[in-house]
């Protein structure tokens, strides 16, 4: 099945943030490596840049938003789960044109692709709680329909 340009962007952002979390490389170094990555030519580059640079720039604020929905310290999560949660939280707060269910579904799929066997269940649960806090009107409308 062909991946959408937006899915490709999220996959590359996950890979870039994974690298950033492990190595603390600069966003410029990560950018340069991603440009040579498989699938870069098919990605929505504007979305990729917005996510990658936005998450790195707002890391502390995003962690602060995620933490109340976690059952353990964020540094105890796998780097893949952390990267995916950061991306989804960034999208929930900055890409309100994207329905929250799409963001959660994309995060679950990214975790299935790059993470451990059951990490996607945890990510789904955390993001359900987080979406209710960050987008209460949208989540309530969905639950009432």
Curated annotation (Swiss-Prot):
Gene Ontology BP terms: DNA-templated transcription termination; transcription antitermination
Cellular component annotations (GO), alphabetically ordered: cytosol
Keywords linked to the UniProt accession: RNA-binding, Transcription, Transcription antitermination, Transcription regulation
Top-level taxon in the UniProt lineage: Bacteria
This protein's record includes keyword RNA-binding: yes
Transcription regulation is among the record's keywords: yes
MF terms (GO), sorted A to Z: RNA binding
Protein role: Involved in transcription antitermination. Required for transcription of ribosomal RNA (rRNA) genes. Binds specifically to the boxA antiterminator sequence of the ribosomal RNA (rrn) operons.
PANTHER family: ANTITERMINATION NUSB DOMAIN-CONTAINING PROTEIN, N UTILIZATION SUBSTANCE PROTEIN B-RELATED
Similarity comment: Belongs to the NusB family.
Protein name according to UniProt: Transcription antitermination protein NusB
């Amino acid at each position: 099945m062909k991946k959408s340009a937006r899915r490709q962007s999220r996959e590359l952002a996950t890979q870039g943030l994974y690298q950033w979390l492990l190595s603390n490389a600069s966003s410029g170094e990560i950018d340069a490596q991603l440009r040579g990555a498989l699938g870069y030519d098919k990605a929505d580059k504007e979305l990729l840049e917005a996510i990658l640079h936005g998450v790195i720039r707002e890391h502390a604020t995003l962690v602060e938003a995620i933490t109340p929905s976690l059952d353990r310290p964020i540094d105890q999560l796998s780097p893949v789960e952390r990267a995916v949660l950061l991306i989804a939280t960034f999208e929930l707060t900055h890409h309100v044109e994207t329905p929250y269910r799409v963001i959660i579904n994309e995060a679950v799929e990214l975790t299935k692709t790059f993470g451990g066997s059951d990490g996607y269940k945890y990510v789904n649960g955390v993001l359900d709680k987080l979406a209710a806090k960050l987008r209460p009107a949208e989540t309530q409308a969905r639950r009432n329909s």
